[in-house]
């Protein structure tokens, strides 16, 4: 920028202040110096005494200088606050005029930490979102400029090389993803009670961090939070924590001991992997799952202690692998599953205690441990036979000489592909045969298992010459594929009683597929003893063998002259996709039905279930599109997941009192299910249980306390819901897109969950009950409300909670503490009646303020409609719409008076107004002109609606028309009233 000799200098341009608090501008040619003027927003100018020849309000310096530090400088000492900066260029030679002032630059000076604070949540809170010149010790204040600091943004301090110590303010609840990651000098962080969320990688690679105390309000330490914190010596985890996430403390090299609190349920994948000096782990009583590689390669780990009364159920794959100094482990009672390679490579383990509750030990769980040092070819972990370490795997016969008495179980894959093994006789102590324990043993022809209770998945699969098996008399479970491909297996040559014991309760899918049993099928049904285990048409396109009717109650099978038998059980997926099957009679003897037993039997119209049936398992009748009726047994205990999913013609269900649980999706997409009766045993309706059903009405009895996510969602005919008592939780979108017109919520309910009634377009009346404190996001989005009456106990209204409702009036109580952004989005015909300004906490956010006028000081009845309001000059000034404008003063809000709608009342019509409370006759009616003294209280007068009122569609166009301000009487106002319907509008000028 320049000026000709004798001219006027150009004004400085490009004025700005960067993150380092350095003021810069573009140099002006021929300028001899510059004047910098800094003032506060109220016009008070700062005083600078550095240059005596300049004004005390300005600072001049050489033209070569086009920057000046605003902080850490003796020239300017600025406190935190807002300032206006402008700069003038001074002429160098005589005849050269000084420039005009530059355009004003608004500048906000941060705290000396250099943190950048940004308004969020509609201007009610602050977030720290970047670091600025932060160095050394940082204190994030509780409040900033009078408002709480509640969040630290994602990556706010990421990569800062100067910060050493951070104290987080007491109002902060959220610490963002990677907020402090890669801060190499950060040694100390103090987190307050009240923090609820710590983001992923929040402190990752803080290599100098020595100690951390996680507040009790934090429920989860997520992915990578403290990974690669090489100096982290002490971690305090408080009660309240529930989940330690994947890689949360991985690759630490200083942490020697960790105590997991009792409230933690899950320790995530790789959570403490490669903790190089970790020596001791104390596992709390609440931990249920230790996931894959959680403590893997913690090479100094010597001790793992489980709390008494532990809840541990599962150790997943490689959970403690390569912990080379771990000498022993005592697993607590209740543990059920030890995953593959769980202790793989733990070379010092010499002893382990496995409780009888364990029902599965995965392949290689104890490979390369100290247990291998014991003599003999067979490796034992406590009472489990876990490995056969022969290189040649040439065992021929397994019996008591090979498997020691007292052995409880055989782990997964121990004898897989033993090429010479011909016969197996298990000791009477063995109760479990693991997954694929003897798979593909080509010479195995005989198995005797006198006391085995569980034969696991694929245990003897593809043993091609296995002919007979003695199952003993206590067997309860044969899992899927257990004998699949044993092409010569034919136990049906024995009497049915000798084929399978009566103790069997479950047979998995395809457990006997491709055995000789398929060649002895009766009417297309494959039996093993008294169990129907499949059909001859499985996997075939040809349906010529299909049947139209099967009687399993009286089904008789000729077993080569033996006595005839009846069916007692149906295996998992036994009749899957039998399209031609129409009826089944199973009333007498079938006590067990397997998972997915009749999956997608599209022509099945009904089934009579035995009174002895106790459980209907997952997917049992899923996709039986022709099923019209089902009578549930009087002693039924449970209905599994998706048990009747998409039974499109099923009309009604009566759930007996004996039933205590219903699985998720149990009756999902039963589009013609119009009637359901709940018994006294049900306490919870699970997620999606009746989603997309044909229900018209439903009564929720007193014994039910929880209604799950989308439980009745998208049921297009559901119009009436009666909740009789004690529901404490209604899940996300539980009634979304239904045809509800009204509902009474119980006093026991404290929160209306997000999207609970989303898109229920006919819903116009809700009795909120006395307990509701919070209304979630989108809770009533797109409903049919005309008058929204928020009850006095509600404290919080979520985003878009009442958006798209076309409401004409909104009444708000003083109990409200926060109204989220756009809570009433698109309700642009409404007027808001608020008991006080306190009722509008957080109101000026988004559509709430931009489009809706407000009247303060309204009197609202317990039912939520407006009883009266005061006509006064003060009130006149407070009837407005907030409009965002941009002018010379920048972007700001202005108020304009607008035509507003009078309050509504469900089922009644406005008859006019009276100055006496409780009046039955209106004093002012259509066409009246009247004067109203300042402070007059007008009371609405209501009457019953009649047919001519058309209350659902007709609304008052104008009630107060032209509030006459031509009168200069300070004590009165004049209005003309026009009444025409249920709601009204008036214009105040």
Give the residues covered by each predicted segment.
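Conserved aromatic anchor
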Residues: 21-30, 913
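Beta-strand-rich modules
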Residues: 76-95
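Consensus positions within tandem repeat domains that build extended binding/scaffold surfaces
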Residues: 154-156, 176-179, 199-202, 222-225, ...
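Extracellular fibronectin type III
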Residues: 93-109
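Structural beta-strand segments of beta-rich domains
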Residues: 19-23, 896-898
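Structural signature of tandem-repeat unit edges
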Residues: 116-121, 133-151, 161-174, 184-197, ...
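Secondary-structure capping and domain/repeat boundary segments
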Residues: 523-524, 631, 722, 856-949, ...
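Recognizes extended acidic, P/S/T-rich segments that occur
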Residues: 38-78
């Amino acid at each position: 920028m320049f000026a000709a000799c004798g001219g006027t200098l150009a004004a400085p341009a490009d004025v700005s202040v960067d993150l380092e608090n350095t003021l810069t501008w573009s140099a002006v040619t021929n300028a001899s110096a510059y004047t910098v003027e800094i003032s506060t927003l109220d016009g008070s100018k700062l005083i600078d005494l550095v240059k005596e020849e300049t004004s005390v309000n300005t600072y001049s310096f050489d033209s070569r200088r086009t920057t000046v530090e605003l902080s850490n400088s003796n020239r300017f000492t600025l406190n935190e606050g807002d300032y206006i900066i402008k700069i003038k260029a001074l002429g160098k030679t005589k005849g050269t005029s000084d420039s005009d002032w530059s355009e004003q630059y608004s500048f906000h000076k941060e705290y000396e930490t250099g943190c950048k604070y940004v308004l969020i949540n509609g201007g009610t809170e602050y977030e720290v979102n970047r670091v600025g010149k932060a160095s050394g010790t940082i204190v994030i204040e509780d409040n900033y400029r009078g408002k709480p600091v509640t969040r630290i943004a994602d990556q706010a301090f990421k990569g800062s090389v100067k910060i050493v110590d951070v104290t987080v303010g007491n109002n902060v609840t959220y610490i963002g993803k990677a907020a402090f990651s890669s801060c190499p000098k950060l040694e100390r962080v103090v987190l307050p009670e009240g923090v609820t969320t710590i983001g992923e990688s929040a402190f990752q690679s803080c290599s100098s961090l020595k100690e951390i105390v996680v507040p009790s309000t934090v429920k989860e330490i997520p992915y990578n939070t403290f990974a690669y914190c090489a100096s982290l010596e002490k971690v305090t985890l408080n009660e309240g924590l529930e989940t330690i996430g994947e890689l949360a403390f991985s690759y630490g090299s200083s942490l020697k001991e960790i105590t997991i609190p009792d409230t933690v349920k899950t320790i995530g994948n790789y959570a403490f992997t490669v903790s190089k000096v970790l020596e001791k782990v104390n596992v709390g009583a609440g931990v249920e799952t230790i996931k894959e590689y959680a403590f893997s390669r913690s090479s100094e780990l010597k001790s793992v202690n489980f709390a008494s009364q532990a809840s541990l159920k599962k150790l997943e794959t490689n959970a403690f692998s390569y912990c080379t100094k771990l000498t022993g482990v005592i697993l607590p009672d209740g543990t059920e599953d030890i995953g593959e390679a769980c202790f793989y490579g733990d070379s010092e383990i010499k002893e382990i205690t496995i409780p009888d509750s364990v029902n599965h030990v995965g392949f290689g769980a104890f490979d390369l441990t100290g247990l291998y040092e014991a003599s003999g070819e067979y490796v034992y972990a406590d009472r489990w036979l876990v490995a056969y370490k022969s290189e040649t795997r040439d065992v021929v016969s397994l019996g008591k000489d090979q498997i020691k008495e007292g052995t409880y179980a055989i782990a997964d894959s121990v004898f897989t592909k033993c090429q010479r093994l011909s016969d197996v006789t298990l000791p009477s102590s063995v109760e479990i045969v693991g997954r694929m324990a003897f798979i593909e043993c080509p010479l195995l022809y005989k198995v005797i298992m006198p006391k085995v209770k569980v034969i696991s998945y694929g245990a003897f699969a593809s043993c091609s010459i296995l002919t007979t098996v003695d199952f003993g008399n206590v067997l309860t479970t044969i899992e899927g594929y257990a004998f699949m491909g044993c092409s010569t297996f034919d136990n049906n040559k024995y009497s049915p009683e000798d084929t399978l014991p009566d103790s069997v309760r479950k047979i998995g899918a395809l457990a006997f597929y491709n055995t000789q049993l398929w060649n002895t099928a009766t009417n297309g049904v494959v039996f093993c003893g008294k169990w129907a285990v499949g059909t001859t048409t499985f996997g075939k396109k040809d349906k010529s063998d299909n049947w139209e009717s099967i009687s399993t109650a009286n089904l008789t099978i000729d077993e080569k002259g033996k006595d005839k038998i009846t069916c007692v059980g149906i295996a998992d997926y036994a009749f899957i996709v039998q399209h031609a099957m129409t009826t089944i009679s199973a009333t007498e003897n079938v006590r067990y039905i397997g998972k997915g037993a009749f999956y997608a039997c599209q022509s099945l119209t009904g089934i009579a279930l035995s009174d002895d049936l106790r459980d209907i398992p997952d997917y049992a009748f899923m996709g039986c599109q022709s099923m019209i009726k089902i009578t549930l047994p009087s002693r039924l205990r449970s209905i599994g997941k998706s048990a009747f999913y998409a039974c499109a013609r099923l009309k009604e269900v009566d759930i007996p009192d004996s039933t205590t649980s219903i699985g998720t999706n149990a009756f999902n997409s039963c589009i013609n299910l119009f009637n359901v009766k709940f018994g006294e045993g049900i306490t919870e309706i699970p997620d999606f249980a009746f989603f997309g059903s044909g229900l018209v009405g439903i009564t929720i009895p007193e014994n039910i306390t929880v209604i799950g996510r989308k439980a009745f969602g998208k049921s297009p005919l559901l119009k009436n819901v009666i909740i009789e008592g004690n529901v404490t939780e209604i899940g996300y979108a539980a009634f979304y897109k239904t045809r509800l017109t009204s509902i009474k919520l119980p006093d026991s309910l404290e929160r209306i969950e997000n999207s609970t009634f989303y898109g229920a377009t006919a819903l116009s009346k809700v009795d909120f009950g006395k307990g509701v404190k919070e209304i979630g996001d989108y809770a009533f989005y797109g409903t049919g409300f005309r008058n929204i009456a928020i009850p006095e106990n509600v404290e919080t209204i979520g985003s878009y909670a009442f958006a798209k409702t076309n409401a004409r009036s909104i009444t708000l109580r003083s109990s409200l503490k926060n109204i989220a952004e756009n809570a009433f989005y698109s309700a642009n015909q409404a007027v808001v009646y608020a008991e006080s300004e306190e009722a509008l906490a957080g109101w000026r956010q988004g559509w709430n303020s931009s489009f809706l006028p407000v009247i303060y000081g309204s009197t609202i009845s317990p039912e939520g409609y407006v009883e009266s309001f005061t006509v006064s000059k003060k009130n006149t000034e407070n009837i407005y719409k907030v409009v965002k404008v941009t002018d010379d003063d920048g972007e700001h809000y202005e108020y304009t008076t607008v035509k507003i709608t009078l309050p509504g009342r469900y089922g009644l019509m406005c008859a006019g107004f009276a100055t006496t409370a409780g009046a039955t006759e209106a004093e002012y009616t259509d066409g009246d002109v009247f004067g109203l003294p300042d402070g007059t209280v007008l009371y609405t007068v209501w009457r019953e609606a009649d047919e001519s009122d058309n209350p659902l569609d007709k609304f008052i166009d104008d009630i107060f028309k032209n509030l006459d301000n031509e009168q200069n009487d300070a004590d009165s106002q004049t209005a003309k009233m026009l009444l025409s319907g249920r709601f009204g509008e008036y214009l105040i000028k």
